[in-house]
Amino acid sequence: MTAAENVCYTLINVPMDSEPPSEISLKNDLEKGDVKSKTEALKKVIIMILNGEKLPGLLMTIIRFVLPLQDHTIKKLLLVFWEIVPKTTPDGRLLHEMILVCDAYRKDLQHPNEFIRGSTLRFLCKLKEAELLEPLMPAIRACLEHRHSYVRRNAVLAIYTIYRNFENLIPDAPELIHDFLVNEKDASCKRNAFMMLIHADQDRALDYLSTCIDQVQTFGDILQLVIVELIYKVCHANPSERARFIRCIYNLLQSSSPAVKYEAAGTLVTLSSAPTAIKAAAQCYIDLIIKESDNNVKLIVLDRLVELKEHPAHERVLQDLVMDILRVLSTPDLEVRKKTLQLALDLVSSRNVEELVIVLKKEVIKTNNVSEHEDTDKYRQLLVRTLHSCSVRFPDMAANVIPVLMEFLSDSNEAAAADVLEFVREAIQRFDNLRMLIVEKMLEVFHAIKSVKIYRGALWILGEYCSTKEDIQSVMTEVRRSLGEIPIVESEIKKEAGELKPEEEITVGPVQKLVTEMGTYATQSALSSSRPTKKEEDRPPLRGFLLDGDFFVAASLATTLTKIALRYVALVQEKKKQNSFVAEAMLLMATILHLGKSSLPKKPITDDDVDRISLCLKVLSECSPLMNDIFNKECRQSLSQMLSAKLEEEKLSQKKESEKRNVTVQPDDPISFMQLTAKNEMNCKEDQFQLSLLAAMGNTQRKEAADPLASKLNKVTQLTGFSDPVYAEAYVHVNQYDIVLDVLVVNQTSDTLQNCTLELATLGDLKLVEKPSPLTLAPHDFANIKANVKVASTENGIIFGNIVYDVSGAASDRNCVVLSDIHIDIMDYIQPATCTDAEFRQMWAEFEWENKVTVNTNVTDLNDYLQHILKSTNMKCLTPEKALSGYCGFMAANLYARSIFGEDALANVSIEKPVHQGPDAAVTGHIRIRAKSQGMALSLGDKINLSQKKTSL
C-alpha cells in the first residue's frame, strides 16, 4: 500500500494567499503570547508541518510553553500536532523530548475531565511508537473502569489498536476485554468490546455469545448488528456451526431495529436454503418494505426479493407470498409500485392468480376514485398491463378482467385507455369464447369514448369481430348515434342559420353611445362580436372529431362500415334489407366526403383519406369475392400473425432469461460432500461483508484479465510530456455517481519541489468534490494524488487543469505545467433498457431535444452497421429481429437506453443502401436522437460520430 492510499486522519484547509510565517515569529508567539496568540501560532505550525516543513527548533518550545496549558482548544490542537510531528531521529530512535510528552499523555489519561481522557485515548489509537505507549499501559487499563461510557468506549478502542499493532504490550487484552464485556452495561461499550473480540479472539467472542444467546433480542441494535456479522463470518468459515447459531438469527428477525432485521434476513438466506428460512427472510423483507417510509429503502429491499426470486428453489417459496408482496402497493411511490407489480407477475402461478387478479381489480377501481394525478394515470397503466399479462398467461382469468378494464376505454387519460384497447384487441383475437362478451361491453362504452385514437381502435374491433346480424345492426346504430343528423353539411348549416335568428332580434335593443379618442361618437351593439355557437361538447363524439378536421377516423369508419356491410350481405338473404344496409353505409361515407370538401371543418380532408373512403364506396358498389376476402379474412390474419410473432418473441426472451438463471453443472464437475471437504474448501461463496466493504472503498474486483481492453492500463491517460519537469499520468476509475482520478506525479528534476499542487477544473455537469492538498517532492521522487469528481448527469465532461509548484531555494515565481484534457466517456453511465412501442412514441413526442446525425461510414451491410451503432452507444434495439431480417435495401430501427440517473435516450436509425452504386456501396441515411436534456442528445451524437470515424479509418 502506498503512502497516498493510507488512511488520512487530518485534513486541514490551507489558505493559498497567506504568507508563510517565519520560525522566529512563531517561537516568539508560542513563548510570550497569550492563549489566543499561542492557539493561532500552533495552527500555523501544524499547517507548515503538513506542507513538509520540519521545524525541529519549535518542538522544545511547544513542550515548555504550550504543553502545560489547560485550555481545551490548545489540547485538541496538541493532539493533532503530536500526531503529525516527527517523533524519531533520522536513524529511527525516539527523540529524548518525547519522554516529556509521554508524561503529559499520562496526566491527560488521569485528567478529571472525561472529554480530555476520551480524546487522548482516541489519539493513542494513531500512535505507532511502542516506546511511547509502554509507560501509558497502566493508565489505559485504568480507563476501563472510568464512570463515564465515553472514556470506557475509547479505552476499548485504544486497547484493541495497541494489541493489534504491539501484542507484547498487552498480551492479556482478549481476556481483559472479555471480563469487561461480561460486566459492562452500556451498549456502545459492549459493541466496541465485542467487535474487538471478533477480530482478536473469535473463540472468546463465541463463548460470550453462547452464554447470552437467549438475551440477544434485548441488546441494543449496534451490538445486534455486530452479532449478526460474527455469526455470518463464523458460519461462512465453518458451515458446521450453522445449526448452533441459526436460531439466534431467527430471533434477530424480530428485532425492533430495521437495520438489524435487514442484515439478519440477508445472513439467514446465505446460511440456509431451507424453505422455512427463505420464507422467514422474505416475510421480514416484505414487512420492512411496508413499514419503512423511505422509498430508497423500499427499492433496495425489493431488489433483495428480486435476487431471491432469481434462485429456482427460492422462487417456489416466494410464490406463496405473492399476496403479501402485493401489500406493498399501498405505497404511493410509482417506482416502488412498478417493481412490486413486476415481481408479483414473475411469481404468479395458477394457484394464486385468481387472488392476484381480485387485488389488482380493486386497485384499478381505487385509481378511478382518486383525484386525477400524473402518477395515478401511470399507475393505472401499470395495473392494466399487469392484468393484460395475467390474462394472456392464464386465459381463464380474462373473463373476470375484461368487464372491469373496458370501463376505462372512456377514460380521459389516453395512454391508459390505449393499454386497455391493446389488451382487448389481443383478448378478442385469442379467446373465441369471450368475443360475444367483449363486443357487448364495447357497444356499451362506445358512445362514451373521448379520445379519437381510442375511437379508431374501437371501430376496428367492432368492424372485425361483429359476426351476428344483431351485433352488426347495433354497430350501425351506434355509428349513426355518434355521427348525429345527416347529411352533416346541411344539418350544420341549418343549425347555424337557426341560431342566428334570436341574435337578429337582439340587435334592435338599445344602443349605448361611446366617445372615442378622436372625440367622435361611436355606437356599441348589444350583439356580441363573436356569435355564440352550440357548445362543442354537445356534439356527438364522431361528429365532433370530423368537424375538428380529424378525417383519419373517417377512413377507419369507412373500412368498418365496409366490413360489416359485406358481412351483413352474407348473413341476410333478403335483397331489400341487403340493399338498404349497404346504401346506408354508402350514405354515411358520402356525407363524410361532402363534409371534408366543405368549409365547415377546421382542417380539410386529406387526399389519402379521400382515396380510402372512395375505395370503400367502390368495394360496396361492386361487392367482388376478392374484396370480400381481403376485408373479412386477410385483415384478421395479419393481426393473428402480428400477435403470434409478439408471443414468440416474448417466449424467446423468457427462455434466454431462464437459461441465464439456471446454473449449468457439467458432467465432470466434482460433487461436494460437506463431511469430506477440507475446512478451507468448505464454502465457495464469497464473503458478503468483505465484498460490500470493497465496493464502498471503490475497490470492487472486476474480471479484467479475460479482456485486456477492459484492464486498468487501458484507462491510463498521459497528462504531461516526458520532457516536462513534472510528469503526470492518471488512471480514471469510474464509479456509479463519481469519478476517482488516481494521478501519478513524478519530479523529473534534481530540485526539491515545494507546494506541488494539482489544480483541476471541470467542464460539463461535473463537480470537483475537494481540492487536492499540496505536497513536497524530493528530487526524482514521485507521489500519488487522488481527486474525486462528482457526476450529476449523463453528459460528455472534460476535466482539465495544471500542476503548479515552487522550486526550493529559487526566487522565481511559481512554475506551472499545463495538463492534457481528460474526456469522460458517457458510455460508463448508459445502460440498455426496454420500453413498449407506445411508451417510445410518447417519449418521442414529449422530448424536445433532437440531434440528427448523418451516416458517414464505409460499412456496406445494413445489419452490420446497426450492430456497430448498438455496440458504440450501449443502446438496445426495440425493433424485433424478424422485422430486421431479410434484405430489402433499407432499414429502420428504434433504439432505447437509460442512464443511471434515470434519463431516457431514444434513437431512430433510418438507413439504406443505394442500389445504383452497386453491391459495394456504403450505407447512407441518418440517425435521430431524442432526449429530455440537450447534453444527453449532443453527447450521444458525438459518440456516434466518433465511432463512425473509427470505422471509416
From Swiss-Prot:
Membrane topology term: Peripheral membrane protein
Main location: cytoplasm
Matching InterPro entries: ARM-like, ARM-type_fold, Clathrin/coatomer_adapt-like_N, Coatomer_bsu_C, COPB1, COPB1_appendage_platform_dom
Entries under SUPFAM superfamilies matching the protein: ARM repeat
GO cellular component annotations of the record: COPI vesicle coat; COPI-coated vesicle; cytosol; endoplasmic reticulum; endoplasmic reticulum-Golgi intermediate compartment; Golgi apparatus; Golgi membrane; Golgi-associated vesicle
Cell compartment(s), UniProt: Cytoplasm; Golgi apparatus membrane; Cytoplasmic vesicle, COPI-coated vesicle membrane; Cell membrane
Post-translational modification: Proteolytically cleaved between Ser-528 and Ser-529 by CAPN8.
Keyword RNA-binding found: no
General function of this protein: The coatomer is a cytosolic protein complex that binds to dilysine motifs and reversibly associates with Golgi non-clathrin-coated vesicles, which further mediate biosynthetic protein transport from the ER, via the Golgi up to the trans Golgi network. Coatomer complex is required for budding from Golgi membranes, and is essential for the retrograde Golgi-to-ER transport of dilysine-tagged proteins.
Summary of subunit composition and partner proteins: Oligomeric complex that consists of at least the alpha, beta, beta', gamma, delta, epsilon and zeta subunits. Interacts with SCYL1. Interacts with CAPN8. Interacts with COPG1. Interacts with ARF1 (myristoylated); this interaction is required for binding of COPB1 to Golgi membranes. Interacts (via trunk domain) with ARF1 (via switch I region); the interaction is direct. Interacts with KCNK2 (via N-terminus); this interaction increases the channel-mediated whole cell currents and promotes plasma membrane expression of KCNK2. Interacts with PRKCE. Interacts with STX17. Interacts with TMEM115.
Protein name as catalogued: Coatomer subunit beta
Taxonomic source organism: Rattus norvegicus
Gene behind this protein: Copb1
